[in-house]
C-alpha cells in the first residue's frame, strides 16, 4: 500500500496538475502559491521522499497558474497561460530552482495537459463563449489541441470539448476521458 503525500498542502500550495510514472516511482505535482511566491513542482515517490522545485522566468519568481503537468520520456510538460514549458526530468530531480524560459505558444489557454509516447494534448478550461461548436448534444465552448512531441509548434488536431475541463487523457483503447470541476471553497 504505497502512497505519497504532497508536501505543499500545509504551506499555501494550490495543487493543479499531477503526473505519475510508476516505472520510475515518480509523482510530479504542479502548484501555484496563495502568497504569490514562485509556482512549484513537487517531486514525491512511494517512499514519501520529497523535493520542491521553485520556477523562475527571466530570473524572477514565476507565479503562473501551472494548471497541468505531463511526463513523456525524459521530459515534463507544464501548461500555463497560452504556453507549454518543456523541462528535462533530470533538472527537476536535481535542481531547486528551474528557469522555464519563454515556453512554446499554443492556440489555447493551456489549462491542462496529457502526454503519451507520441503526442502532447493541451486544452483549456474555458467557460465563456470562446470556441462555440454546436452539435446534437449541445454547445461546446473549449478546445484541446494535439501536438507531436517532435514539433510542439504545429497542431496535429484540435478537438472541441465541453467547458470547465480540468483533466484529460486518452486511454490505451483510444477513448478520450474528460474530468470537470470548478470553484471548490477554501
For the regions a language model picked out, list residue spans one by one.
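Repeated scaffold domains used in trafficking and secretory/extracellular systems
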Residues: 12-19, 61-68, 105-117, 162-170
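Blade-loop segments of beta-propeller domains
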Residues: 14, 48-74
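Short coil/turn segments that connect the beta-strands within blades of beta-propeller domains
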Residues: 23-25, 73-74, 117-118, 173-175
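Short, conserved, GDST-rich strand-edge loop motifs in beta-rich repeat architectures
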Residues: 28-35, 123-140, 181-186
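Beta-propeller blade signature
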Residues: 39-47, 135-150, 186
Amino acid at each position: 500500500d504505497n502512497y505519497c503525500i504532497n508536501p505543499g498542502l500545509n504551506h499555501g500550495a494550490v495543487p493543479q496538475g499531477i503526473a505519475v510514472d510508476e516505472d520510475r516511482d515518480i509523482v510530479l505535482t504542479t502548484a501555484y502559491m496563495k502568497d504569490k511566491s514562485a509556482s512549484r513542482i513537487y517531486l514525491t515517490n512511494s517512499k514519501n521522499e520529497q523535493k520542491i522545485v521553485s520556477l523562475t522566468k527571466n530570473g524572477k519568481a514565476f507565479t503562473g497558474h501551472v494548471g497541468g503537468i505531463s511526463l513523456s520520456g525524459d521530459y515534463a510538460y507544464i501548461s500555463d497561460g497560452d504556453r507549454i514549458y518543456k523541462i528535462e526530468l533530470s533538472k527537476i530531480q536535481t535542481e531547486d530552482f528551474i528557469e522555464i524560459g519563454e515556453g512554446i505558444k499554443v492556440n489555447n489557454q493551456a489549462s491542462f495537459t496529457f502526454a503519451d509516447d507520441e503526442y502532447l494534448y493541451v486544452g483549456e478550461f474555458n467557460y465563456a463563449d470562446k470556441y462555440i461548436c454546436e452539435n446534437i448534444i449541445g454547445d461546446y465552448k473549449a478546445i484541446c489541441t494535439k501536438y507531436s512531441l517532435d514539433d510542439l509548434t504545429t497542431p496535429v488536431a484540435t478537438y472541441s470539448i465541453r467547458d470547465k475541463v480540468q483533466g484529460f487523457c486518452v486511454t490505451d483503447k483510444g477513448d478520450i476521458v474528460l474530468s470537470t470541476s470548478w470553484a471548490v471553497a477554501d
